[in-house]
Amino acid sequence: MDEKQLVSQALSAAIDGVLGVEQIAAIIEKPKSSDLGDLAFPAFQLAKTLRKSPQIIAGEIAEKIDTKGFEKVIAVGPYVNFFLDKNATASEVIREVLTEGEHYGDANIGEGGNVPIDMSAPNIAKPFSIGHLRSTVIGDSIAKIYEKLGYQPIKINHLGDWGKQFGLLITAYKKYGDEATITANPIDELLKLYVKINAEAKEDPEVDEEGRQWFLKMEQGDEEALRIWKWFSDVSLIEFNRIYGKLGVTFDHFMGESFYSDKMDAIVEDLENKNLLHESKGALIVDLEKYNLNPALIKKTDGATLYITRDLATAAYRKKTFNFVKSLYVVGGEQTNHFKQLKAVLKEAGYDWSDDMVHVPFGMVTQGGKKFSTRKGHVVKLEMALDEAVDRAEKQIEAKNPNLENKEEVAKQVGVGAVKFYDLKTDRNNGYDFDLDEMVSFEGETGPYVQYAHARIQSILRKANRKVNIDNISLVVSDAEAWEIVKALKEFPNIVKRAADNYEPSIIAKYAISLAQAFNKYYAHVRILEDDAQLDGRLALISATSIVLKEALRLLGVAAPENM
């Protein structure tokens, strides 16, 4: 039973149901110091009803309460403080972790419901920059978390492969491009053309108009325009898939904006039939004043569609195809207004399922405090950064463990894992500065620090060379360090649920750091391999810790090497 539930039931019985179990569970607190117990109930809540001071109420409850399952229950001022039965709790938690293994913390909350996750979405014909990392790894981690809770995540790469920028790129290719040069080095050469034509279009309206015309041709199915565009797309995907391979990220579908180009007319017609489209300066809009939003521009004066038109078609397609219980969009915070408009237009059209669409925004990655911008050519390629992280990891592993057999493979797991972990430990709505020195450090709140704790446990278990009997686990928790680990292990299922509820992988990353820290304190304080009556209990404790560390890392898409 959950410890909050245990405390809440005992309290509700002690106060004759004046507050229900759920009401009590909602106000249970954790004392600032473990010396004051594991959980605390503030008696202020009962003062008005019972017409007594909180201090008196706390004292009466502490005397009356059934202490089964607790080491002791005491009144501390206006609080009732609960000390869990450490030995019984430890045995129960460790047995549960060792029995369930990687499935510890699994639940069937989702009951198999489909959850499309719109993620990654790099623009074709542009480098896969560090700026694309966040959507990719946050989306991948959320998918793993949701799968653990019984949902069916569907990872969709909504490639940026449609829009006026491709009309401009075709313009640049026709003016300056050389097929052989581009074939030899596709992304770099296309980036040069893109930066060059954007600078020209800013200065010369005719260049901008030419790009607009080429995009219009794409929308109208012009053979030449689509042939060039398809070539841009094919060479881009080769590069993207190589990078996804390094990141260890897979997708269920690659469906770019272009996939929906033949599905937009139906949604525009639907809006028209529902009298939601209004003309404004020759363009078609949906008025969203009642939502305190600007009008949504659905079609421009020249008939060209916009980002929101394509997203309306996308949302309708996903509902029809996947019948989702939730549809997530892992897209930067700068698009918040766009998603408000998108949901409002669907709501106006009578699609109440739009309530199940969730924008999962995130903060920006900078370097040296500067934003990455493809238009201006300020790009740091993610692949180069990953390769550099792996090199740095390998040098540190060489220094720590020169005889390690599979050094190169471990360096990849540590280097790539370090970059992913650093991103995911950052609160999703916050940005961060991309700093490889900090990311790949084996000290501090980093991926390598957590991986090293896991590898250290594996090393101890190999040295012990002893099978633990799950049915006969008995751990005498006589030190604070062991108790901190037990409490952390007990909390893991709740951590997973909280991460899912908040679409926040950082909750799991921070948990992994604190569990690794708790283990390292225990390791420094206790002779784990001392051959005494408690040896099996200690081995069971660290074995359970290893299982949960590995699973926490897996949920973040980070490997857990056995040796480092």
Swiss-Prot record:
GO molecular function terms listed in the Swiss-Prot or TrEMBL record: arginine-tRNA ligase activity; ATP binding
Compartment(s) where it occurs, according to its Swiss-Prot or TrEMBL record: Cytoplasm
Secreted among keywords: no
Catalysed reactions listed for this entry: tRNA(Arg) + L-arginine + ATP = L-arginyl-tRNA(Arg) + AMP + diphosphate
Major site of localization recorded for this protein: cytoplasm
SMART domains documented for this protein: Arg_tRNA_synt_N, DALR_1
Subunit organization: Monomer.
Protein name per its UniProtKB record: Arginine--tRNA ligase
Organism in which the protein naturally occurs: Lactococcus lactis subsp. cremoris (strain SK11)
Lineage: Bacteria, Bacillati, Bacillota, Bacilli, Lactobacillales
Gene, per the UniProt record: argS
